[in-house]
Amino acid sequence: MSTLVQCGYFERGQCQSCRHIKLPMAQQLAAKTQELQQLLAPFVDNAEAQFLPPVVGDSSGFRNKAKMVVLGAAHAPVLGIVSPSGEAVSLCDCLLYPADMQALLHRLERFVQQAGIPPYRVDKAKGELKFILLTRSQVRGEYMLRFVLRSRDAIARIERELPALMAEYPQIKVVSVNLQPIHMAILEGEEEIFLTENTRLEERFNDVPLFIRPKSFFQTNPQVAAKLYQTAREWVADFAPASLWDLFCGVGGFGLHCAAKDIPLTGIEIEAEAIACAKMSAQLMGLDKVQFMALDSTDFAKGDAAQTKPELIIVNPPRRGIGESLCHSLSEFAPKAILYSSCNPKTLAKDLGHIRGYRLTKVQLFDLFPHSDHFEVLALLVKD
């Protein structure tokens, strides 16, 4: 826990993303724990509330996704970021990535050079290749590779060089082009063009098969995420719920860990691609009493579905939290328990202030984002 990660990028002032990388891991965790305890102090005045020990993973080589800005020129491309001083910095050797991912990122720099694709220049609004997005599946070490382009003009060049790349790296299973024509700081556009027959990457956390498609959200630290899902499964099992809701369900990680063949599960997520992935997982697992729907979670809770109230509700919202309206809906449904997984303890605390008739009984910090201010929290609320 006292391990220090030595990062040359940070030392040279080229990248400050891991702002706490100079602190020992134990010190980072202590600061995060203190912040969490202070934010949730108003909700732990009952003797039953437990702050469980934080869950940690490796301090380097843990990240499964790289979002690289493509800089430089067609003959000398750079995958990385613009440093605070304005220079193009290659981040292919970023210590957050496993060694095999670092090697592939270096190969992708050569790929862009061989294909002769001009990087997009924000200052001149010219060029083609904006980003390269690379996602790694830990279960098999396989990859999904996405090229974010301004237009279709460079697709032929990618297709020309792709066979050699995939022969060298057969673990690349999914390749796509995302079209983002707008001159704005937007990561991706609406249109996705697949250059491979396969359109999804398979992952497995614990005994649950999960799938990743280009636009579906997926946890970036598989090692700790697996522990997060397993903990959720154990906490939910204590209540033996007859029915479950999983709101903001993404690809179904929480719900599928907590589901069983005889328990009806309803999963709600606004991103249709993620729902398609969740349905594939449920089918593979032989879960017949599961339905996943691409809807807004707040709207769903206010609709006709509100007449069929579940015994336990899982929520895993984005950083903005679930909001006052959904808090009121959950209070009215009065399930046995609410399991809240949060990536923003500030909005978690705000939401807890709007949920009525429940007491906080368990809290656990999961350090999915070492060296940063961010962390995940699992909070269990039990009906009074």
Curated annotation (Swiss-Prot):
SUPFAM superfamilies given for it? S-adenosyl-L-methionine-dependent methyltransferases
The protein's role, per its UniProt record: Catalyzes the formation of 5-methyl-uridine at position 747 (m5U747) in 23S rRNA.
Q: Does the keyword Transferase apply?
A: yes
Protein's name according to its UniProt entry: 23S rRNA (uracil(747)-C(5))-methyltransferase RlmC
Task: List UniProt keywords, sorted A-Z.
Answer: 4Fe-4S, Iron, Iron-sulfur, Metal-binding, Methyltransferase, rRNA processing, S-adenosyl-L-methionine, Transferase
Q: List the disulfide bonds.
A: none
E.C. numbers? 2.1.1.189
Xref: Gene3D superfamilies: 2.40.50.1070, Vaccinia Virus protein VP39
Q: Which reaction does it catalyse?
A: uridine(747) in 23S rRNA + S-adenosyl-L-methionine = 5-methyluridine(747) in 23S rRNA + S-adenosyl-L-homocysteine + H(+)
Q: Which GO terms describe its molecular function?
A: 4 iron, 4 sulfur cluster binding; iron ion binding; rRNA (uridine-C5-)-methyltransferase activity
Identify the InterPro entries for this entry: 23SrRNA_MeTrfase_RlmC (IPR011825), MeTrfase_TrmA_AS (IPR030390), MeTrfase_TrmA_CS (IPR030391), SAM-dependent_MTases_sf (IPR029063), U5_MeTrfase_fam (IPR010280)
Which residues does the record give as [4Fe-4S] cluster binding sites?
7, 15, 18, 94
Binding sites annotated in the UniProt record for S-adenosyl-L-methionine? 219, 248, 269, 316
Residue numbers annotated as active site: 343 (nucleophile)
Q: Which family does it belong to?
A: Belongs to the class I-like SAM-binding methyltransferase superfamily. RNA M5U methyltransferase family. RlmC subfamily.
Task: Provide the GO biological process annotations.
Answer: rRNA base methylation
